[in-house]
Swiss-Prot record:
Domain of life: Eukaryota
Tissue spec. comment: Ubiquitous.
Role summary: Transcriptional coactivator of the p300/CBP-mediated transcription complex. Acts as a bridge, linking TFAP2 transcription factors and the p300/CBP transcriptional coactivator complex in order to stimulate TFAP2-mediated transcriptional activation. Positively regulates TGF-beta signaling through its association with the SMAD/p300/CBP-mediated transcriptional coactivator complex. Stimulates the peroxisome proliferator-activated receptors PPARA transcriptional activity. Enhances estrogen-dependent transactivation mediated by estrogen receptors.
Keywords: Activator, Developmental protein, Differentiation, Nucleus, Repressor, Transcription, Transcription regulation
Keyword Nucleotidyltransferase on entry: no
Protein name as annotated: Cbp/p300-interacting transactivator 2
Main location class: nucleus
Lineage, opening ranks: Eukaryota, Metazoa, Chordata, Craniata, Vertebrata
Start-end of Gly residues biased regions: 165-198
An example Gene Ontology biological process: embryonic placenta development
Gene name for this UniProt entry: Cited2
GO cellular component assignments: chromatin; cytoplasm; cytosol; nucleoplasm; nucleus; protein-containing complex
An example Gene Ontology molecular-function term: chromatin binding
Length: 269
């Protein structure tokens, strides 16, 4: 094979070498460089071709600096899975069906943001309590397009302040036009600036929802007042021993303890 390659490369290069100590394209008998100076100029352009040189069998073909490797349809040539087109390798890979649209394209991001906004509105409308959440945009380039519809998610407080057991969302209102949001309650109210976000009251000890990561959409802070109102409403504060505490224990131990506790009462009766 080495003799065959030397015969193919003999007399092709003006410096008298046979091409075995140069670019991998020379080893395949595909290079047509006139001088070493021209070879140094073309060296950065053939970085992709040098990587592809390990996977192509020796055969007829041509090397082009602008269009990459264009395989000949003759015998002894392997296409390697790429179509025999004159496009650059980067252009062929960018048009692949496995790659998404570029980030800079605004045409595909707007329908996706509209669909996300529709899902967010359905989620917040079916929420049991009318909290004003913060929902950041998942697409970084579509933030300026949805300012009119997402403004009420940004300008309102993540949690309401109030001394009553009911959430203060009934007294709060947020305007999407950018005039700020107000959240009412028994403890007080806070008014936000014009489109810049609202100031957090001192009574709220929770972390602002704006610091949440963008992929967490179901994270909600626990309001102790609402939780205690539910406990009092269902009467859980009057129960000494909850039956859920027995879950996860052995049934034999549960029955033994239950029978031992019930025997003195039976004897006394």
């Amino acid at each position: 094979m080495a003799d065959h390659m030397m015969a193919m490369n003999h007399g092709r290069f003006p410096d008298g070498t046979n091409g075995l100590h140069h670019h991998p394209a020379h080893r395949m008998g595909m290079g047509q460089f006139p001088s070493p100076h021209h070879h140094q100029q073309q060296q950065p352009q053939h970085a992709f071709n040098a990587l592809m040189g390990e996977h192509i069998h020796y055969g007829a073909g041509n090397m082009n600096a602008t269009s990459g490797i264009r395989h000949a349809m003759g015998p002894g040539t392997v296409n390697g899975g790429h179509p025999p087109s004159a496009l650059a390798p980067a252009a062929r890979f960018n048009n692949s069906q496995f790659m998404g649209p570029p980030v800079a394209s605004q045409g595909g991001s707007l329908p996706a943001s509209m669909q996300l906004q529709k899902l967010n509105n359905q989620y917040f409308n079916h929420h049991p309590y009318p909290h004003n959440h913060y929902m950041p945009d998942l697409h970084p380039t579509a933030g300026h397009q949805m300012n009119g519809t997402n403004q009420h998610f940004r300008d309102c407080n993540p949690k309401h302040s109030g001394g009553s057991s009911t959430p203060g969302g009934a007294g709060g209102s947020g305007t999407p036009g950018g005039s700020g949001g107000t959240s009412g309650g028994a403890g007080g109210s806070s008014a936000g600036g014009s489109g810049g976000g609202s100031t957090m009251p001192a009574s709220v000890a929770h972390v602002p929802a704006a610091m949440l990561p963008p992929n967490v959409i179901d994270t909600d802070f626990i309001d102790e007042e609402v939780l205690m109102s539910l406990v009092i409403e269902m009467g859980l504060d009057r129960i000494k021993e909850l039956p859920e505490l027995w879950l996860g224990q052995n049934e034999f131990d549960f029955m033994t303890d239950f029978v031992c506790k019930q025997q003195p009462s039976r004897v006394s009766c």
